[in-house]
Amino acid sequence: NICKLCSFKTTSKKLNMKKVFFLVATVLFLGCTNNGVENDCFPFITVNESVNLDLPQFIDLQVPGGWAYTSGGLQGLIIYNLNGVQFKAFDRLCPGQNPSSCSQMTVDSNLRILCQCDDSEFNILNGAPLTEGVTCFANEYLVDNLNGSLLRITNF
């Protein structure tokens, strides 16, 4: 009988350890989140666009400081040539706005990105808000310069 009691205690300890392990694993699993940047200002959309800089509609993108609009994203994209090699791309949807006729951002002559819904302005170099009280940045996408004349625009 003593051997059966010892066996019961060992089995009981194993069951308790399994419960503890399961509980810890569950807490760790549920407590983990992705390491991506949370963006409450825009709904998520997969972006995978190609832009051929040799096409006539993108001739302004061939020089540093040039910019152009193209399709893609939530309401189109703004592409900006930083220095002849590096490019920036931003969604034309105004941060924090639902798609509408006033929520498609434009670029002004001072190279600011403008939202006419709330008169907010954004820096074309990094998407930072220039308007006091605005906390959301313009939604930026990753631009890969594949061969000097072909750009690939995707989510980060």
Where are these regions (language model features)?
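Cysteine-centered motifs
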Residues: 3-6
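Positively charged n-region of N-terminal signal peptides that target proteins for export
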Residues: 13-20
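C-terminal motif of bacterial Sec signal peptides marking the signal peptidase cleavage site
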Residues: 28-31
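N-terminal pre-ligand scaffold of iron-sulfur
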Residues: 34-109, 123-124, 139-156
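Short cysteine/histidine-rich metal-coordination sites, predominantly Zn2+-binding motifs
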Residues: 108-118, 129-141
